């Protein structure tokens, strides 16, 4: 709940800035890159969330890791988050920004968590199936790998959850056996 309260104003401010500068597409691409980095690097997330690490160190790492891949305005926004002590909420801010940005373009976001990295073909197939199910013009996948799923994947889109994971099936069996 706290993450949402913090994430929404920053995401809305970044969206407003991107619209004012006619750079929504570039900013969305930048935030997508940031989001992928965070999804693939738990170490980076921990580093940014660690209150014992100085702001200058966090800024330096962000510049080194993302500086060449994202635009100057987005990097400045990240530095602002560091200065305000909100960089630990970057994942939530990025997700909320992408959600708002895509909503403006009639694009749905689906959080896909799988036990292994999905191939490009698997991603395409999932996106096509979700388009048919939701009726959305376009689907963007927010990918995450969680080996604890054992096998399969989960999809969160809107308020719906599709769980085809082995862990989910084991929970269902456990619940059924517990009810007997």
Swiss-Prot record:
Subunit composition and interactions: F-type ATPases have 2 components, F(1) - the catalytic core - and F(0) - the membrane proton channel. F(1) has five subunits: alpha(3), beta(3), gamma(1), delta(1), epsilon(1). CF(0) has four main subunits: a(1), b(1), b'(1) and c(10-14). The alpha and beta chains form an alternating ring which encloses part of the gamma chain. F(1) is attached to F(0) by a central stalk formed by the gamma and epsilon chains, while a peripheral stalk is formed by the delta, b and b' chains.
Cellular location(s): Plastid, Chloroplast thylakoid membrane
Membrane topology, record value: Peripheral membrane protein
Pfam families referenced in this protein's UniProt entry, alphabetically: OSCP
GO cellular component: chloroplast thylakoid membrane; proton-transporting ATP synthase complex
Similarity comment text for this entry: Belongs to the ATPase delta chain family.
The name this protein goes by in its record: ATP synthase subunit delta, chloroplastic
NCBIfam families: ATP_synt_delta (TIGR01145), PRK05758.2-2 (NF004402)
Top-level taxon in the UniProt lineage: Eukaryota
Record-level Gene Ontology MF annotations: proton-transporting ATP synthase activity, rotational mechanism
Purpose of the protein: F(1)F(0) ATP synthase produces ATP from ADP in the presence of a proton or sodium gradient. F-type ATPases consist of two structural domains, F(1) containing the extramembraneous catalytic core and F(0) containing the membrane proton channel, linked together by a central stalk and a peripheral stalk. During catalysis, ATP synthesis in the catalytic domain of F(1) is coupled via a rotary mechanism of the central stalk subunits to proton translocation. This protein is part of the stalk that links CF(0) to CF(1). It either transmits conformational changes from CF(0) to CF(1) or is implicated in proton conduction.
Entries under PANTHER family matching the protein: ATP SYNTHASE DELTA CHAIN (PTHR11910)
Family matches, as SUPFAM superfamilies: N-terminal domain of the delta subunit of the F1F0-ATP synthase
UniProt keyword annotations, A-Z: ATP synthesis, CF(1), Chloroplast, Hydrogen ion transport, Ion transport, Membrane, Plastid, Thylakoid, Transport
